[in-house]
A protein has these predicted regions:
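N-terminal, active-site-proximal structural segment of metallo-dependent hydrolase catalytic domains
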Residues: 15-80, 165, 275-279
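Acidic/histidine-rich helix-loop elements
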Residues: 28-50, 110-127, 153-156
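Active-site neighborhood of phospho(di)ester-bond hydrolases with catalytic His/Asp-centered motifs
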Residues: 64-67, 88-89, 181-185, 205-209
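Bacterial Sec-dependent N-terminal signal peptides
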Residues: 1-23
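Metal-dependent phosphoester-hydrolase catalytic domains
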Residues: 109, 158, 162, 172-180, ...
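Structured beta-strand-rich core segments of catalytic domains in phosphoester-bond hydrolases
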Residues: 63-144, 152, 248-250
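Short, Asp-centered acidic motifs that coordinate Mg2+ and/or phosphate
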Residues: 24, 62-63, 145, 179-181, ...
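Active-site metal-binding loops of divalent metal-dependent hydrolases
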Residues: 29-31, 150-152, 185-186, 267
Length: 279
């Protein structure tokens, strides 16, 4: 598979480069695929792309892991985010990594599949689709930061459980002692068997580790601001030694005439962390 780094716009001058001890804002966000039924309900992409970009701008994220993008929709979104660049692991990328220009250089990137044969496009266990992880190794002042952006299968419980085990192995072998962020739409909640399969010697949940948190509702919002949600399928994990300053589920809406709408059927989950390597 040909790998490439897609930079959709000319690079801006480097304004700031991170160092260990500095803080970084990361978000994971499933921006919803294009379901024809969404158009009928008034939640079509043409309405949503502007509010999605507005949320990213308003919260000043340094890195965003997206899920359920598509090539032409990602191109449209990046046109609204000229201060960001995008990492695509393939021409048909749905889980890109978006990062602020000038903060990092990309040392390496790619994808592996959530299957028994992760090196090739494949699905295993009871997975309905061939799911994968988009990853990147970012450099800042001679230091490294690994990003693992995933979207687990929604159908197969065995696939979810085995994908969690695979992520344990991949993060351990690829990141080593370097700081990392493992995040995405995992399609399971914190009380599930799959969640319990994540190795706490390798990672911790930023939600439970945060110094402060804002959790007005679950991350899955049904596209309905009037419906309370208790389901959080979107998670962010970091190494045990990483300081998590803030965790938030962002209950952001936009106005469409007299109606309030969500930009996606998932709310973005965001953290503020202090970068640092293992002592």
């Amino acid at each position: 598979m040909t790998r490439f780094l897609a930079i959709l716009f000319a690079l801006l001058p480097c304004i700031h480069s991170l160092s260990y001890g500095e803080e970084l804002r990361y978000a994971t966000w499933n921006i919803r695929w294009e379901d024809p039924k969404d158009v009928e309900k008034g939640d079509d992409w043409e309405k949503r792309k502007g509010p999605i970009a507005n949320v990213i701008h308003a919260h000043n994220f340094d890195i965003v892991g997206l899920q359920e993008g598509s090539p032409y929709r990602l191109k449209q979104l990046m046109e609204l985010l000229p201060e960001y660049e995008i990492i695509l692991s393939d021409t048909m990328e749905f889980n890109p990594i978006v990062m602020r220009k000038g903060m990092f250089t990309v040392a390496d990137f790619g994808r592996f599949y959530l299957s028994k044969t992760p090196e090739k496009k494949s699905k295993s266990w009871d997975s309905k689709h061939a799911r994968y992880c988009t990853w990147a190794k970012l450099k800042f002042k001679q230091n490294s930061l690994f990003i693992f952006n995933v979207h687990f299968d929604y159908h197969g419980k065995d696939a979810q459980a085995e994908s969690a085990k695979l992520m344990n192995r991949k993060i351990f072998s690829m990141a080593g002692n370097a700081p990392f962020i493992f995040a995405g739409d995992l399609n399971f909640t914190a009380d599930s068997k799959s969640y319990q399969n994540l190795d706490t010697h390798i990672m911790k949940d930023s939600r439970t580790a945060a110094d402060s948190a804002s959790v007005p509702n679950g991350s899955y919002n049904y596209f309905n601001p009037e419906r309370a949600s208790e389901w959080t399928f979107d998670h962010i994990f970091v190494p045990p030694y990483t300081k998590v300053r803030r965790y938030e589920i962002l209950n952001e809406t936009y106005r469409d005439g007299e109606k309030l709408r969500y930009p996606s059927d998932h709310s973005p989950v965001a953290i503020q962390i202090e970068l640092g390597g293992k002592n």
